[in-house]
Amino acid sequence: RFFRECGVKGVFYNADTEGFGVEQIRYQLLAELNWRPDMTDEEYEALMCELLEKEYGEGWDCVRDYITMWTKAQDTRRTNACWHAIGGNKAMWDNRIDPYYYDTHSGEMISLVEEAIRLASSELQQKRAEMLSCHIYYTTVYTRYYRAEAAGDTALVNTLEGYYATAMDRLRRLGY
């Protein structure tokens, strides 16, 4: 609605439609918004939930809960830089999402995606959830590893290395 009020006629969403997160869902939602720019927040939410259910089956609500948490982690970051591209950051891992949010919530995020994997009723749903899990494990490692290493927290470093190994094992098994 904001873009339309500014005179924008459409949006070219330059992003992958596949991948390890929820890109296909985001892409479909934006396409729907191009055709239905007056969609209410409630209609948008209902459409997102419908798309998530198609992609993830019974575990769709776990993925929706994760998206809420992921959004919060982006909304609470302490800087507006994008992957250090415009500078001004002390720590590269501190600029896309709030790493301190991940300190207290990554365990729940991982539990949510593992539950979505468990609830998958088809091979495709399981693959989608496992691909999403790689994103979640990697983001957890990315946001926490360097600070844990700098603090000498070997227990956390070992846990994070296990997360990384899990993600890499899944990627290999999925053919990546």
Can you describe what each PLM-predicted range is?
Residues 1, 31-33:
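Short, low-complexity, polar/charged sequence segments that are solvent-exposed and flexible
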Residues 1-11:
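Catalytic-core region of carbohydrate-active enzymes that cleave or remodel glycosidic bonds
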Residues 6-8, 33-176:
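Catalytic domains of carbohydrate-active enzymes that cleave complex glycans
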Residues 11-18:
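Short acidic/histidine-rich active-site segments
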Residues 21-30:
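Histidine/acidic-residue-rich catalytic or RNA/ligand-binding cores of hydrolases
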